[in-house]
Regions:
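Structured alpha-helical segments in the cores of large, soluble enzyme domains
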Residues: 83-88
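Short beta-strands and strand-loop turn motifs
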Residues: 99-100, 175
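C-terminal non-catalytic interaction/localization modules
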Residues: 1-59, 67-78, 89-92, 106-132, ...
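A short beta-strand-to-loop transition that corresponds to the Sensor-1 phosphate-sensing loop
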Residues: 63, 100-103, 135-138
């Protein structure tokens, strides 16, 4: 008797592109929660298993990447942490990432930003080596009746979508998650599994080892997510330091200024050191670090000027 073949899949993509519905179609049952808006639904990772022909299919539904996530520190870090969990939860690794997008919607630069975000999490070559592009809303394609097969339609695409097709080596499939026609359900699932099996036969999986190779880019991504908040907090502290520096310059007797300047220099140094720690040698906070260093230089210049003035007075 032939042993069953394991296939491990991770669903990824933009929020509300039908990832959970696709997962249910692959599993042939309602296992994943499917909503029109999943912004708060799929921040975690869930998985279910089913049998199909001689395959045991394990489907993981990853967190959705919404447009707001790309600009929001908290959401961005949540997604990264959830993706890390998806990798550690399945130590055997994944045969394929199913990158889910909708047929019928224009693939924009924002969508490309989502792909870029995912590449910074999983590695620059993960699309090329492990991704299958799945277009949901297959029923919409058929209703348009444009006289083209799906393959012909793909060949006509231009711009960022064409670039994505080329990057994933034209591993693309159309899915209708709404159909009740059993033959159609079986055909699209069979086509997908055949595509995944070709990846499986290479003997490769995306594992934690692949994930660790992308760690540097992922750390920089997380630091960049914090940059707006770190910048705001830093500029607030710098403003207070410079305000106190100006007050000291105008109101404190020359012979007493040094202790005030030393206190301010220590504050500036603490601020600089704290930002360096948060930067984690990624360079993401370079501009903020440079600004803070300039404040230290300004205070050091004031100390030098103060010392010169005191020395000149002592000569008199």
């Amino acid at each position: 008797m032939e042993l069953p073949i394991d296939i491990d899949l991770l669903l990824i993509g933009k929020t509300s592109n039908g990832r959970s519905a696709l997962g249910n179609t692959i599993l042939r049952r309602k296992a994943f929660l499917s909503k029109s808006s999943q912004e708060s639904v799929t921040k975690k990772v869930d998985y279910h298993v089913s049998n199909f022909n001689n395959f045991v299919i394990k489907v993981f539904d990853g967190p959705g990447v919404g447009y707001t996530c790309l600009d929001d520190e908290h959401s961005k870090i949540l997604v990264i942490k959830a993706m890390e969990f998806a990798i550690t939860t399945n130590p055997r690794g994944y045969h394929a990432f199913l990158l889910v997008t909708e047929y019928g919607g224009r693939f924009t630069d924002k969508d490309q930003d989502t792909v870029t975000f995912l590449k910074r999490i999983f590695g620059e070559n993960f699309v090329k080596n492990f991704c299958i592009l799945v277009l949901t809303n297959g029923d919409r394609f058929e209703s348009e009746d444009n006289g083209l097969t799906f393959g012909e339609w793909c060949k006509e695409q231009t711009g960022v979508f064409k670039e994505l097709l080329e990057e994933c080596c034209h591993r693309v499939i159309l899915f209708d998650n709404r159909t009740e026609v059993e033959a159609k359900k079986m055909k699209q699932l069979t086509d997908l599994i055949e595509m995944v099996d070709k990846l499986r036969l290479r003997g490769l999986r995306y594992t934690d080892e692949n994930f660790q190779k992308a760690r540097e880019a992922r750390e920089k991504l997380m630091v960049e997510a914090k940059e707006p908040r770190v910048c705001e907090e830093t500029m607030y502290e710098i403003s207070l330091i410079l305000q106190k520096l100006q007050w000291t310059h105008e109101n404190v007797d020359q012979k007493d200024k040094r202790s005030y300047f030393d206190d301010l220099q220590q504050r500036a140094k603490n601020l600089y050191d704290n930002i360096q720690v948060q930067d984690k040698e990624t360079g993401a906070l370079h501009d903020i670090i440079h600004t803070t260093k300039s404040v230290q230089v300004t205070i050091a210049d004031e100390i030098k000027i103060s010392q010169i003035v005191i020395q000149e007075r002592e000569k008199e």
